[in-house]
Swiss-Prot record:
Its main location: endoplasmic reticulum. It holds the Pfam family CHD5. Residues 30-99, 170-174 are cytoplasmic. One of its GO terms (cellular component) is GET complex. It comes from Rattus norvegicus (Rat). This is Guided entry of tail-anchored proteins factor 1.
């Protein structure tokens, strides 16, 4: 394929990239949750701690407070200590999960921005499509930016339009 043939298909390339980025943006929370779960294996330890707390609470319910106060108090302190330990463990895991999700989101948006900038750089002087100039008469210079071709649709305008259209189409899925 020659350079002029690839320039002719620039509109489809931009549309595909914009569509892909918007689909990934919708799937970003699910994707980051999955990656976080893969990276964190502490949930098993938390469920084990919860099971221990439940068994101790069941044992506590069988102990008579009046007859065996020392055993009852010891078991209650043990439950409180284990509950506090579980709470701190959950807080630490939640903070780490938030950091992982934030990093994934930032990485995605940086990648998306780099992709859009590279598309604008590559197709800076080439119109993505050319339509009769009377169709876009009041806005022809704005729409043609940065190509300066009469009736041309510049890559920046095309990216904005594609982003809006794809966002509207994918809105029910988000």
């Amino acid at each position: 394929m020659s350079a002029s043939e690839t320039d002719r298909w620039a509109w489809l390339l931009v549309l595909c990239f914009v569509f892909g980025c918007n689909v990934l943006r919708i799937l970003l929370p699910t994707l980051s949750s999955f990656i976080s779960r893969v990276l964190q294996k502490d949930a098993e330890q938390e469920s084990q701690m919860r099971a221990e707390i439940q068994s101790m609470k069941q044992e506590l319910s069988t102990v008579n407070m009046m007859d065996e106060f020392a055993r009852y108090a010891r078991l209650e302190r043990k439950i409180n200590k284990m509950t506090d330990k579980l709470k701190t463990h959950v807080k630490a895991r939640t903070a780490q999960l938030a950091k992982i999700k934030w990093f994934i989101s930032v990485a995605f948006y940086v990648l998306q921005a780099a992709l859009m900038i590279s598309l604008i750089w590559k197709y800076y002087s080439v119109p993505v499509a050319v339509v009769p100039s009377k169709w876009i008469t009041p806005l022809d210079r704005l729409v043609a930016f940065p190509t300066r071709v009469a009736g041309g649709i510049g890559v920046t305008c095309w990216i904005l339009v594609c982003n809006k259209v794809v966002a509207i189409i994918l809105h029910p899925f988000s």
